[in-house]
Amino acid sequence: LRTLTPEEAFHFASPSGHVGYAAYSLDQFCDLLRVVPADSITYHQERGDIAHWIEHTLFDQKLAADVTGLMDRQELITLIDERRQLLWSRLQ
């Protein structure tokens, strides 16, 4: 749940290039999923980028496994939002 460096951030792209959004935390990533172009989500999910970033940058193997293959924007948002709420609750 920490804030990431620019090098660690998730940079949203599409087949034609960067789409102008970068997430510097899991919270911000979930918020940006609501507004990034749908083709960006599809692009990253087809390549496995989201699961890879979650596993290797955020070190959350469970969430990475859960998001693998999910193509529906709302399902991704719901799953990630539930996970981040659980993680925040453990810090309180």
Residue spans of the language-model regions?
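Terminal, compositionally biased segments used for targeting/anchoring and flexible tails
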Residues: L1-Q92
